[in-house]
């Protein structure tokens, strides 16, 4: 679970340094994808959902690595294709988070333990709504520039709250998981 938490941390939290059009993200999202992949391997015995999430983590890791390199070299674009690819990447991030919640729900049922998945799901819903709102505003933003800018700020702040809530819920889930006895292999 430690890798799951840190994977989401690297995936959702951005600290960027910008110099002359070159952007250095100090917490590269592809590192988060790699940590998630490792976490999925560790939790594979808890639920097959974790195994099924691995290709999504790999694909998202490749995409975010290419974006990270492009930002570093200053060749990233602000085109419509970038926006559409960003929407797809956000959808994959949300799908991975949803899959983790579902996998942990199965582990809760199997182990008869609370792993804080209800709080994780509520935080995930905040992320889902804010992501949809941000991209909808971004796509219609050219027509209503001043209103769209104000709405985007509100949605981004709500998204930040959602990220914090989700990371706190994953952290609590991690702590609850760590005190569980080792999973017994069924003969």
Please report, for each region that a protein language model flagged, where it lies by residue:
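N-terminal topogenic module of multi-pass integral membrane proteins
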Residues: 1-39
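Membrane-interfacial loop-to-transmembrane alpha-helix junctions, especially the N-terminal start
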Residues: 1-5, 47-58, 120-123
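Juxtamembrane "helix-exit" motif on the non-cytosolic side of transmembrane helices
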Residues: 16-19, 69-77, 136-147
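Membrane-helix boundary/juxtamembrane motif in polytopic membrane proteins
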Residues: 50, 102-133, 175-187
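Non-cytosolic membrane-interface motifs at loop->transmembrane helix junctions
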Residues: 77-89, 147-156
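Generic alpha-helical transmembrane segments
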Residues: 29-33, 63, 67, 86-102, ...
């Amino acid at each position: 679970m430690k890798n799951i938490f840190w994977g989401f941390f690297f995936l959702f939290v951005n600290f960027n340094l910008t110099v002359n059009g070159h952007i250095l993200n100090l917490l590269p999202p592809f590192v988060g994808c790699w940590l998630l992949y490792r976490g999925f391997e560790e939790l594979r015995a808890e639920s097959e959902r974790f195994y099924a999430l691995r290709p999504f983590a790999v694909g998202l890791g490749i995409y975010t690595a290419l974006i990270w390199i492009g930002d570093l070299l200053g060749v990233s674009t602000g085109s419509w294709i970038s926006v559409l690819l960003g929407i797809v990447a956000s959808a994959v991030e949300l799908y991975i988070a949803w899959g983790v919640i579902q996998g942990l729900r199965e582990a809760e049922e199997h182990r008869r333990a609370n792993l804080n998945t209800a709080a994780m799901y509520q935080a995930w819903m905040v992320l889902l709504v804010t992501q949809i709102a941000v991209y909808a505003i971004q796509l219609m933003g050219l027509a209503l520039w001043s209103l769209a800018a104000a709405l985007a700020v509100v949605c981004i702040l709500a998204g930040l709250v959602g990220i914090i809530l989700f990371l706190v819920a994953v952290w609590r889930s991690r702590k609850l998981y760590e005190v569980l006895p080792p999973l017994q292999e069924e003969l």
